[in-house]
């Protein structure tokens, strides 16, 4: 059984924290981070807003990310070993892949591969404050959040909803533990439902046939006597 779970949503919504907690709790679980597929800085264009376009889909090598997902699909065991994940014997038939990122549901070739799609949100002010407390390899220039980050988040979320992509929205203002328990329980229920669906139906007991009644055959009527025909 293979399960691909998306942990998506806005920047600084709590995606990485939730993903790391799930990674430790779920059996035979691997993770792919979308941030690992950013193109080199010299390939990031400057947009009409005057900022480097880090928060658009074109800033990511999504074909390479898709290839990595396909590698997991073709052999979860091999992928797990290559990434230092030990396959648990008691759950050797179950393999889970977590995809974590801010634009998981905007790349069509990936959208239909998810078994579950989660989307973390926090209010504007909270998101802006969290962003200001983070240290990035490439520091945010003044005005980036309001001039680029937030408008791009709104744009891609609106496109996702307009395209009818079904997601489970998560309140990023909840405690880490509460979010973790909520998602873990949902994933475990999905695994249980899938295992029940794939389990063979119990054999129905054979019906006991009465004397002279073979399966699918009617008992022949005795030939009518001459008296009966009169």
UniProtKB/Swiss-Prot annotation:
<dbReference type="GO" id="GO:0005829">
    <property type="term" value="C:cytosol"/>
</dbReference>
<dbReference type="GO" id="GO:0005524">
    <property type="term" value="F:ATP binding"/>
</dbReference>
<feature type="binding site">
    <location>
        <position position="131"/>
    </location>
    <ligand>
        <name>substrate</name>
    </ligand>
</feature>
<dbReference type="GO" id="GO:0050262">
    <property type="term" value="F:ribosylnicotinamide kinase activity"/>
</dbReference>
<feature type="binding site">
    <location>
        <begin position="174"/>
        <end position="176"/>
    </location>
    <ligand>
        <name>ATP</name>
    </ligand>
</feature>
<feature type="binding site">
    <location>
        <position position="35"/>
    </location>
    <ligand>
        <name>Mg(2+)</name>
    </ligand>
</feature>
<dbReference type="GO" id="GO:0005886">
    <property type="term" value="C:plasma membrane"/>
</dbReference>
<dbReference type="GO" id="GO:0061769">
    <property type="term" value="F:ribosylnicotinate kinase activity"/>
</dbReference>
<keyword id="KW-0479">Metal-binding</keyword>
<dbReference type="GO" id="GO:0034317">
    <property type="term" value="F:nicotinate riboside kinase activity"/>
</dbReference>
<comment type="pathway">
    <text>Cofactor biosynthesis; NAD(+) biosynthesis.</text>
</comment>
<dbReference type="InterPro" id="IPR027417">
    <property type="entry name" value="P-loop_NTPase"/>
</dbReference>
<keyword id="KW-0067">ATP-binding</keyword>
<comment type="subunit">
    <text>Monomer. Interacts with ITGB1 alone or when associated with alpha-7, but not with alpha-5.</text>
</comment>
<dbReference type="GO" id="GO:0009435">
    <property type="term" value="P:NAD biosynthetic process"/>
</dbReference>
<keyword id="KW-0460">Magnesium</keyword>
<dbReference type="GO" id="GO:0019674">
    <property type="term" value="P:NAD metabolic process"/>
</dbReference>
<dbReference type="GO" id="GO:0046872">
    <property type="term" value="F:metal ion binding"/>
</dbReference>
<feature type="binding site">
    <location>
        <begin position="9"/>
        <end position="17"/>
    </location>
    <ligand>
        <name>ATP</name>
    </ligand>
</feature>
<dbReference type="GO" id="GO:0005737">
    <property type="term" value="C:cytoplasm"/>
</dbReference>
<feature type="binding site">
    <location>
        <position position="130"/>
    </location>
    <ligand>
        <name>ATP</name>
    </ligand>
</feature>
<keyword id="KW-0418">Kinase</keyword>
<protein>
    <recommendedName>
        <fullName>Nicotinamide riboside kinase 2</fullName>
        <ecNumber>2.7.1.22</ecNumber>
        <ecNumber>2.7.1.173</ecNumber>
    </recommendedName>
</protein>
<comment type="similarity">
    <text>Belongs to the uridine kinase family. NRK subfamily.</text>
</comment>
<feature type="region of interest" description="Disordered">
    <location>
        <begin position="191"/>
        <end position="230"/>
    </location>
</feature>
<comment type="function">
    <text>Catalyzes the phosphorylation of nicotinamide riboside (NR) and nicotinic acid riboside (NaR) to form nicotinamide mononucleotide (NMN) and nicotinic acid mononucleotide (NaMN). Reduces laminin matrix deposition and cell adhesion to laminin, but not to fibronectin. Involved in the regulation of PXN at the protein level and of PXN tyrosine phosphorylation. May play a role in the regulation of terminal myogenesis.</text>
</comment>
<dbReference type="GO" id="GO:0043231">
    <property type="term" value="C:intracellular membrane-bounded organelle"/>
</dbReference>
<dbReference type="GO" id="GO:0045662">
    <property type="term" value="P:negative regulation of myoblast differentiation"/>
</dbReference>
<feature type="binding site">
    <location>
        <begin position="136"/>
        <end position="137"/>
    </location>
    <ligand>
        <name>substrate</name>
    </ligand>
</feature>
<keyword id="KW-0547">Nucleotide-binding</keyword>
<keyword id="KW-0662">Pyridine nucleotide biosynthesis</keyword>
<dbReference type="Pfam" id="PF13238">
    <property type="entry name" value="AAA_18"/>
</dbReference>
<dbReference type="GO" id="GO:0005654">
    <property type="term" value="C:nucleoplasm"/>
</dbReference>
<feature type="active site" description="Proton acceptor">
    <location>
        <position position="35"/>
    </location>
</feature>
<feature type="binding site">
    <location>
        <begin position="35"/>
        <end position="38"/>
    </location>
    <ligand>
        <name>substrate</name>
    </ligand>
</feature>
<feature type="binding site">
    <location>
        <begin position="134"/>
        <end position="136"/>
    </location>
    <ligand>
        <name>ATP</name>
    </ligand>
</feature>
<feature type="binding site">
    <location>
        <begin position="54"/>
        <end position="55"/>
    </location>
    <ligand>
        <name>substrate</name>
    </ligand>
</feature>
<feature type="binding site">
    <location>
        <position position="16"/>
    </location>
    <ligand>
        <name>Mg(2+)</name>
    </ligand>
</feature>
<keyword id="KW-0808">Transferase</keyword>
């Amino acid at each position: 059984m293979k399960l691909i779970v998306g942990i998506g949503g806005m920047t600084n919504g709590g995606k990485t924290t939730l993903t790391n907690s799930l990674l430790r709790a779920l059996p035979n679980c691997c993770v792919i981070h979308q941030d690992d597929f950013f193109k080199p800085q010299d390939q990031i264009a400057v947009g009409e807003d005057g900022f480097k376009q880090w928060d658009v889909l074109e800033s990511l090598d999504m074909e390479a990310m898709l290839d990595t997902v396909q590698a997991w699909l073709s052999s979860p065991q091999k992928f797990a070993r290559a990434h230092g994940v030990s396959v648990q014997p008691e759950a050797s038939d179950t393999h889970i892949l977590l995809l974590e990122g801010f634009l998981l549901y905007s790349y069509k070739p990936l959208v239909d591969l998810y078994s579950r799609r989660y989307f973390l949100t926090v209010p504007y002010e909270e998101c802006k404050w969290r962003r200001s407390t983070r240290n990035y390899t490439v520091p945010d220039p003044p005005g980036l959040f309001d001039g680029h980050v937030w408008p791009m988040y709104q744009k891609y979320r609106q496109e996702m909803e307009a395209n009818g992509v079904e997601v489970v929205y998560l309140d990023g203002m909840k405690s880490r533990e509460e979010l973790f328990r909520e998602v873990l329980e949902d994933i475990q229920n999905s695994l249980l439902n899938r295992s029940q669906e794939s389990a063979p139906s119990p054999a129905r007991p054979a019906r006991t046939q009465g004397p002279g009644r073979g399966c699918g055959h009617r008992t022949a009527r005795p030939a009518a006597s001459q008296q009966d025909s009169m």
